[in-house]
């Protein structure tokens, strides 16, 4: 899971805030490096120092985290979920998702998506309670 990283490195902090909302863009690492006004190499070194992750690993973890949430909460096609988080190649998305979570996207949905018609544990399914009526 991607942790919210706090850093005093201004350009990296700005990039982390930007990528949180723009993770699906094409070439996000290049976009962050350009945004930071640092060379690609300097950006990568400073990003690693600030987050303990390589930029591409951070972006992929963020994308998979968002994909997990979408798979759990929507009935949309897995390929569409992959596209929505920034992957143009469905095969690559499925492989990366499985490598990250240990499950294929379809298996993840079967395991973690709520069952249709199920009630949350806090909802009474026996009908309304008659409190105070005699």
Annotate each PLM feature:
Residues 43, 67, 93:
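Short hydrophobic/aromatic patches on the structural cores and recognition surfaces of FHA
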Residues 14, 38, 42:
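Donor-nucleotide binding loops and adjacent catalytic segments primarily
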Residues 41, 90-91, 106:
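Key DNA-contact positions within bacterial/archaeal DNA-binding proteins
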